[in-house]
A protein has these predicted regions:
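Bacterial carbohydrate/catabolite-sensing allosteric modules
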Residues: 1-6, 51, 89-102, 108, ...
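N-terminal helix-turn-helix DNA-binding module of bacterial transcription factors
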Residues: 1-69
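Residues at secondary-structure transition points
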Residues: 7-11, 36, 40, 58, ...
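Short beta-strand segments enriched in small/hydrophobic residues
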Residues: 19, 26-29, 63-79, 85, ...
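Short loop or secondary-structure boundary microenvironments that flank
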Residues: 31, 77, 105, 242-243
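Amphipathic helical "hinge" segments at domain boundaries
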Residues: 54-122, 126-133, 226
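Short glycine-rich anion-binding loops that position phosphate/pyrophosphate groups of nucleotides
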Residues: 136-138
Length: 261
């Protein structure tokens, strides 16, 4: 296919249509993955798109499909590796599916319902298609469940805390329950492996350093540890830490060692 077009001029959908020998509506259907296009026509349009270097306007696609192809993500715990790693993985998978991520961060311990709702309102102004909420703490989990949004939402959290997952789901309207999913790391399975390893080595006593109680992962791990350790008759002493700072755990350990010696 040979084209004549002014250099540096962004190609239009009409140029793609002319080159492919189809209507601009057909080009739009191909761009928006409509099933109402034959394979041969789709291939011809795609060849024209590739030759011209055409890139569809996101705003035009959103207008035509009534979808922004954007996911709004709210997360707490900006300074912690686990949550940053989760955001990176989610963004990578979204990009593979032709979706965009719009990310906003909140303080995981100080976030209020009003803060959370304001962020959701901002995302709604962007016409996001769905929400992902990374809720490491009880206050964020409760806010995510109470959020007044009608789009599909995925809440990433842990099973245990001041509010159970079942209690959280009860805060969501019946209509929105069908559009809500909750996922998280299998903290119980991980702790079962830890306790099993201690049993294999024949240990009968252990110190358990528990993370901040307002963090749902820490709460879940502690519940799992207590039940699983008791089942194996492991005598455990719980050392509570108020932060995830390694220096705090180190100071607790030194204090215990000094007391023993």
């Amino acid at each position: 296919m040979v084209t004549s077009r002014k250099p540096n001029k962004r190609p239009s959908m009409f140029e793609v249509a002319k080159l492919a020998g189809v209507s601009h509506q057909t080009v739009s259907r191909v761009i928006n993955d409509s099933p109402d296009v034959s394979d041969a026509t789709r291939a011809r349009v795609q060849a024209a798109i590739d030759e011209l270097g055409y890139r569809p306007s996101n705003s035009a696609r959103a207008l035509a499909s009534r979808r922004s192809r954007t996911i709004g993500l709210i997360a707490g715990g900006l300074k912690f590796f686990g949550l940053i790693s989760a955001i990176t993985s989610i963004e990578s998978i979204a990009r593979e599916h032709g979706l965009f991520m719009s990310v906003m961060m909140v303080h995981e311990a100080l976030c209020t319902q009003s803060d959370f709702d304001n962020l959701c309102d901002t995302f709604n102004e962007q016409n996001v298609d769905a929400f992902i909420f990374l809720t490491p703490t009880d206050v964020m989990f409760a806010a995510a469940c109470r959020a007044r949004v009608n789009q599909p939402r995925v809440i990433v959290t842990s099973t245990h805390g001041q509010m159970t997952v079942r209690e959280g789901m009860s805060l969501i309207s019946t209509a929105n329950k069908r559009r809500t999913a909750m996922v998280g790391i299998d903290q119980w399975g991980a702790m079962a492996k830890v306790v099993s390893l201690l049993g294999e080595y024949g240990h009968k006593s252990a110190l358990y350093f528990a993370g901040p109680n307002e963090w749902r992962d820490a709460h879940t791990r502690l519940d799992a540890w207590r039940k699983l350790a008791a089942a194996r008759s492991i005598d455990s002493q719980i050392v509570r830490c108020h932060t995830w700072d390694a220096d705090e755990a180190y100071a607790h350990m030194n204090h215990l060692l000094d007391a023993v010696s």
